[in-house]
């Protein structure tokens, strides 16, 4: 028997439904740890709890699906009054917009936060990264660098890391680098780069452009060598030598950094099966040279030429020329008088090195795969530029860019007497004219490319870089 003042109150059904929904949501929430990546596969939790922090970077990476297919939506709140953010909004609710599978938000979370996911397609998987520093998932603006190919090989380079600080020499100790400059030790904590190469026909560009999606694709070919190389002033790079590729095939290449960041794609084409030149790279006196030159295959077991097996008949005259040029250059009062507010003798030496290497190592091209309007010239080794190359090897030469010569002319003191041919007086006989800068009216190309190469593997003239 109940006393009159002990009555049972029945809650309204609408309130019971709200309480039940709140309890269900609380039970299905996952807590996202900081500086960690959570991989989600179906069934997907609808809500995630974010911890309290002055600032967090929340990033999303879709791991399945295509860039044109259906994608989920992600809503985020850093307000303690909004328990279930979604399309209907609420206090401080933000939608994380996805672009090619990536999306991120950075802001304060002083009261914690909630991440909601809706409209998840079947079988969709994704990653959520939370960091109190920089964004974990990212599509970077950088890309791999294409060196060159043969019929079955390719030289590729990662984006630069560990940039070197090379201060300009100052008076009175104005010493220029030697012909063979000393190479510092490689960084002890290099970036964790992974190369992915696949035939373009496999359609990697139609996938979500994220590291977790691209990593599911098996890379084509064999990484015959992976090492570090100080290719240019931008810093150290990872150099990859790929072998086992198919002749006359279009390839797409990505570089993944630290498992979660991905570069923009680049494209390249292997040469035809009759291509007879060999790759050369890793020359300390010509560090940026990384392309095919008119040499027979290197002695086994080497797959390419480098400083250890390049014939001395080729390297010694080049090193001697660099030494003599440097000696002559230092007779100018580089450390006492400023001859230019823009460049120094060190800039002159570097520009001359680039030019000398470009003209000494003729770059082979394949007429079957070269881009239209490239600066091609049928040649015979030995050629007029470097008679040290062995004879009897006919090849098609990709002429040096005229700008490689004019850059040296601009950077160097006039007393050296360095001069370049001009477009109106047959410069195109020995240089690629009108590909980077505008040539004279009517010149082939007319500067329409505005560059010596592009991300699609087209190379119009040899810059020596």
Predicted feature residues:
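Fungal secretory targeting signals
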Residues: 1-27
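Non-catalytic, beta-strand-enriched accessory regions in extracellular/secretory proteins
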Residues: 27-108, 112-114, 125-129, 137-185
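Solvent-exposed loop and beta-edge segments used for protein-protein assembly and interaction
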Residues: 52, 109, 245-247, 349-351
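Beta-strand-rich binding-surface signature
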Residues: 55-57, 73, 239, 250, ...
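Short, flexible beta-strand-to-coil junctions
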Residues: 59-67, 118-122, 256-259, 359-364
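Mature extracellular/luminal domains of secreted and GPI-anchored eukaryotic proteins, especially small
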Residues: 213-215, 219-223, 227-236, 260-465
């Amino acid at each position: 028997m109940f006393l009159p003042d002990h009555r049972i109150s029945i809650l309204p059904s609408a309130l019971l439904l709200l309480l039940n929904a709140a309890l269900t949501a609380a039970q299905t929430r996952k807590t996202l740890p900081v500086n960690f990546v959570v991989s989600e596969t179906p069934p997907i939790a609808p809500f995630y709890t974010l911890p309290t922090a002055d600032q967090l970077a929340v990033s999303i990476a879709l791991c399945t699906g295509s860039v044109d297919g259906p994608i989920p939506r992600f809503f985020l709140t850093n307000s303690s009054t909004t328990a279930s953010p979604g399309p209907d909004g609420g206090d401080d609710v933000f939608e994380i917009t996805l672009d090619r599978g990536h999306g991120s938000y950075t802001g304060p979370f002083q009261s914690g936060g909630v991440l909601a996911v809706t409209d998840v397609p079947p079988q969709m998987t994704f990653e959520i990264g939370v960091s109190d520093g920089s964004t974990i998932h990212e599509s970077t603006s950088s890309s791999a660098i294409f060196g060159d190919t043969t019929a079955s090989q390719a030289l590729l380079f990662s984006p630069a890391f560990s940039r070197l600080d090379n201060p300009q020499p100052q008076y009175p100790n104005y010493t220029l680098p030697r012909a063979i400059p000393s190479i510092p030790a490689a960084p002890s904590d290099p970036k964790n780069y992974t190369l992915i190469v696949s035939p373009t026909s496999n359609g990697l560009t139609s996938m979500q452009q994220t590291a977790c999606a691209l990593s599911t694709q098996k890379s084509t070919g064999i990484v015959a060598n992976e090492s570090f190389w100080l290719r240019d002033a931008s810093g150290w790079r990872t150099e990859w030598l790929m072998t086992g590729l198919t002749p006359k095939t279009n390839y797409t290449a990505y570089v993944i950094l630290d498992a979660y960041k991905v570069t923009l794609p680049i494209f390249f084409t292997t040469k035809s099966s009759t291509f007879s030149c060999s790759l050369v790279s890793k020359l300390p006196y010509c560090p940026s040279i990384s392309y095919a030159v008119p040499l027979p295959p290197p002695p086994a077991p080497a797959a390419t030429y480098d400083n250890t097996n390049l014939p001395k008949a080729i390297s010694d005259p080049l090193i001697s020329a660099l030494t003599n040029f440097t000696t002559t250059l230092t007779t100018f009062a580089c450390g006492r008088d400023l001859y230019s507010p823009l460049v120094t003798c060190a800039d002159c030496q570097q520009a001359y090195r680039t030019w000398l290497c470009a003209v000494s190592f003729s770059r082979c091209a394949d007429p079957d795969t070269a881009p239209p309007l490239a600066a091609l010239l049928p040649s015979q080794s030995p050629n007029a530029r470097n008679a040290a190359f062995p004879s009897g090897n006919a090849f098609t030469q990709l002429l040096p860019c005229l700008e490689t010569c004019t850059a040296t002319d601009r950077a160097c003191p006039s007393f050296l007497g360095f001069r370049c041919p001009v477009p109106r007086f047959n410069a195109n006989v020995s240089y690629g004219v009108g590909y980077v800068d505008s040539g004279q009216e009517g010149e082939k190309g007319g500067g329409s490319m505005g560059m010596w190469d592009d991300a699609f593997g087209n190379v119009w003239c040899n810059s020596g870089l």
